[in-house]
């Protein structure tokens, strides 16, 4: 299971009238819209239903998770709890060994053009990923996807993209840089 925006199942505006008047191109960039119903509970219910099907031992999410939605602090505490529960459930029970996510770049100016969160959020998610792995005695990997030569990306941005992930990942965990090659 998974795909683009894998954890956005049933997410839409709480009040469709507000959405109809909205001129923004994204409900999640540069910040998560207060009108977005970002409840991860319906998706957790699907995971549990799939896992209960006869012949299914375990279901996996391979990629497509928007970690910015999981890290966002919502005004509604029940949404924060659902995001936290989803994050732990995802990492502990629905990763087959590698979870692929798409920070897509390391430079904030390029990421703004892509409507993606700051690369620092990838680091925050990596720390949570590693913590849950330790807590459950797992040895899973978080694999970042990057895009090169995006319009608006300079040669200096590309040079930073070439070195930043290795430097950050080695400082975030005991993950060996040589494993990135």
Residue ranges and their predicted role:
Residues 1-143, 147-151:
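Conserved SAM/AdoMet-binding glycine-rich loop
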Residues 156, 160, 172-173, 178-181:
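C-terminal accessory regions of radical SAM enzymes
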Residues 94, 168-170:
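Structured loop/turn residues at beta-strand edges in well-structured enzyme cores
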Residues 50, 90, 165, 175-176:
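Generic low-polarity alpha-helical segments
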Residues 78, 150-167:
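Catalytic cores of alpha/beta
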């Amino acid at each position: 299971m998974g795909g683009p925006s894998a954890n956005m199942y049933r997410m839409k505006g709480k009040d469709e009238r507000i959405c109809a008047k909205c001129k923004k191109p994204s409900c999640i960039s540069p910040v998560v819209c207060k009108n977005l119903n970002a409840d991860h509970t319906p998706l957790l219910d699907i995971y549990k239903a799939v896992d209960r099907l006869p012949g299914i031992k375990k279901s996996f999410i391979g990629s497509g998770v928007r970690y910015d939605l999981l890290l966002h602090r919502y005004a509604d505490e029940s949404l924060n709890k659902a995001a936290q529960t989803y994050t732990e459930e995802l990492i502990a029970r629905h990763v087959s060994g590698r979870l692929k996510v798409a920070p897509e770049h390391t430079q904030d100016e390029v990421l703004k053009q892509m409507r993606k969160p700051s690369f620092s959020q990838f680091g925050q998610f990596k720390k949570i990923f590693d913590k849950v792995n330790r807590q459950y005695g797992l040895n899973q990997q978080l694999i970042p996807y990057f895009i090169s030569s995006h319009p608006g990306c300079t040669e200096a941005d590309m040079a930073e993209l070439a070195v930043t992930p290795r430097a950050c990942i080695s400082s975030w965990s005991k993950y060996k840089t040589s494993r990135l090659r």
